[in-house]
């Protein structure tokens, strides 16, 4: 087990100051960071004064003239929340227009942008098409739609080569907007705030919870002051007004506690939306999206719950929440099947001899929509980079030159998801893959991206990545904020760190601490709930408890001795509240045995 201090500990700093400094927050900025206000929300016109005026004018024209309007819902959590903000906001102002002249389109799969819905658009008389969270670079489709006399408004945050000449584009990446860590939901919310400004209203404030969830869903950086304020304010209990978010918080109240935090949303709300997008039917996706709409969520619909009576009804949002849980369970079962398949390949093909685990799958073996999730799990379990690739046949562009008369010639590629393993020190896995010169493409983030490799290059790719990663350590490297010695760790420090729970999220990693040379004896070691959920507990005289979930009788007995066993422990700080009492805990992530004695003096 390897661990390393993020920065040398400055004894003059409080735990809060040390941890914020370790995450790139300057001492002079810390008070502001912890106490953001509405003054930290940027002026929406910074998205482009002329563009935002044009977008508002196009929307107002559509409303005033009852023009048929389409909202294209992008296929992820940010896309769903972006579109929900816009439709809810417009319903507040123009309920008749939304009811009679506005439609939305849900993708059947994980396709982004306009490519799969052009036929639908062209078969309908939509004059205005609004696309939140997507399509900034769909230039050819913009041109086609404009030539057909349709107006397109893009409300996006994705990078693109240039601003489209055939659409009205609001995009923080393509403008002078200072905050590049604002998601599509944030851009839509800012557009609604601009509409409030020109008409003298405050309706956009009602949807900051959706903006918060969208930013969490797209993993926007919490180092951004504006983004942090949107998320912090949006998740305050008094601002949770969206039926879906409120319902998910209630369903997951045991895990979330009495409030939604960024990391809580990322673990207990966002995955239910993303699993629906990946694994839900179109009907299931629609009911989830409707549960985010105030004019739909509380409608009474026929119940489909087990054991319902004929004709029994329930609120749409209640059915949506239950459906989201069921789809997530269904996806988990598919993940488990996929895990079993690829783990069998690891053993059969002796794959652990290589630095990158490359799975070459046949079509249909694993649903492409969950391949990335399985890659994540394999990466974490086997502690090395993963490529989860499926074979596909691609028409050779030079077919007509290869034979007379020409016959179709296909090249075999393997395409899919790549995941790097940052805990081993790899921060640039995408670059490593590209530097082989053998990939057709590698696009996305450094440690989570899509990749394509021609079949004939696979063996050479394995050879080159083995060489590039020859120094890769298979065991994880934990970056910790503090290294404590045995019983020197204090309850106050653990609780101070635990109380930072509200700030953990993207680029504000949850704090890890190391406790070295901790002596475990039969007097301070307990196995709780051994028959149901075995949980290891080590209790110090100062009342700090070390907790390891998912333990076993076997693990307990290995640590049990008449003397003592000495451990180094990596863990997360937690404040456990029970019956009004708060006690400090360290939740064990990993540990190693470094010594033992038959005697305990």
Region locations from a protein language model:
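Accessory interdomain/linker segments of ATP-dependent helicases and helicase-like nucleic-acid enzymes
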Residues: 484-544
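Glycine-rich, acidic loop segments that terminate in or are immediately followed by a histidine
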Residues: 143, 222, 243, 278-283, ...
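OB-fold single-stranded nucleic acid-binding module
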Residues: 449, 457-462, 556, 565-601
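An N-terminal, well-structured beta->alpha segment
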Residues: 1-72, 92
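Beta-strand/loop nucleic-acid-binding surfaces
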Residues: 376, 541-561
């Amino acid at each position: 087990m390897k661990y390393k201090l993020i920065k040398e500990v400055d004894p003059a700093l409080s735990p809060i100051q040390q941890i914020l400094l370790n995450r790139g927050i300057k001492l002079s900025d810390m008070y502001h960071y912890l106490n953001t206000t509405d003054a930290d929300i940027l002026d929406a016109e910074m998205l482009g004064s002329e563009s935002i005026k044009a977008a508002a004018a196009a929307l107002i024209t559509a409303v005033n003239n009852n023009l048929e309007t389409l909202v294209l819902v992008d296929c992820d959590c940010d896309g769903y929340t972006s579109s929900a903000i816009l439709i809810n906001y417009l319903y507040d102002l123009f309920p008749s227009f939304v009811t009679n002249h506005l439609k939305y389109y849900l993708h059947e799969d994980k396709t982004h942008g306009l490519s799969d819905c052009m036929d639908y658009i062209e078969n309908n008389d939509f004059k205005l098409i609004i696309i939140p969270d997507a399509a900034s670079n769909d230039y050819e489709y913009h041109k086609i739609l404009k030539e057909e006399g349709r107006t397109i408004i893009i409300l996006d945050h994705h990078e693109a080569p240039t601003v489209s000449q055939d659409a009205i584009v609001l995009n923080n990446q393509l403008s002078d907007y200072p905050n590049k860590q604002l998601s599509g939901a944030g851009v839509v919310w800012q557009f609604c705030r601009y509409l409030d400004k020109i008409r003298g209203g405050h309706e956009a404030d009602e949807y900051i919870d959706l903006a918060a969830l969208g930013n969490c869903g797209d993993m926007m950086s919490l180092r951004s002051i504006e983004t942090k304020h949107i998320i912090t304010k949006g998740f305050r209990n008094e601002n949770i007004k969206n039926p879906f978010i409120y319902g998910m918080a209630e369903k997951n109240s045991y895990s979330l506690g009495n409030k939604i935090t960024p990391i809580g949303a990322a673990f207990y709300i966002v995955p239910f939306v993303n699993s629906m997008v990946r694994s839900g039917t179109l009907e299931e996706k629609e009911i989830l999206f409707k549960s985010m709409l105030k004019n739909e969520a509380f409608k009474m619909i026929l119940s489909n719950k087990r054991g319902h009576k004929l004709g029994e009804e329930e609120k749409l949002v209640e059915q949506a929440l239950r459906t989201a849980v069921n789809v997530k369970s269904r996806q988990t079962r598919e993940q488990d099947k996929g895990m079993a398949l690829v783990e069998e390949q690891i053993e059969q093909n002796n794959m652990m001899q290589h630095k990158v685990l490359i799975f070459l799958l046949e079509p249909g073996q694993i649903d492409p929509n969950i391949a990335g999730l399985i890659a994540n799990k394999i990466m974490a379990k086997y502690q090395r980079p993963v490529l989860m690739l499926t074979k596909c046949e691609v028409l050779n562009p030079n077919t007509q030159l290869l034979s007379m008369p020409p016959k179709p010639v296909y090249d075999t590629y393997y395409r899919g998801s790549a995941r790097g393993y940052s805990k081993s020190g790899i921060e640039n896995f995408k670059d490593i893959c590209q530097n082989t010169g053998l990939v057709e493409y590698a696009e996305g983030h450094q440690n989570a991206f899509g990749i394509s490799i021609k079949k004939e290059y696979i063996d050479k790719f394995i050879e080159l990545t083995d060489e590039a990663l020859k120094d890769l350590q298979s065991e994880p490297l934990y970056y910790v904020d503090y290294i404590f010695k045995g019983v020197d760790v204090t309850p106050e420090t653990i609780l101070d760190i635990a109380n930072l729970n509200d700030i953990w999220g993207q680029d504000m990693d949850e704090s890890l601490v190391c406790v070295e040379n901790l002596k475990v004896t039969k007097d301070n070691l307990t196995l709780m709930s051994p028959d149901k959920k075995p949980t290891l507990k080590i209790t110090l005289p100062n009342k700090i408890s070390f907790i390891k979930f998912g333990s076993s009788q076997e693990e307990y007995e290995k640590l049990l001795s008449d003397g003592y066993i000495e451990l180094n422990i990596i863990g997360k700080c937690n404040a456990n509240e029970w019956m009004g009492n708060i006690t400090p805990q360290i939740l064990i992530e990993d540990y190693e045995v470094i010594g033992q004695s038959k005697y305990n003096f």
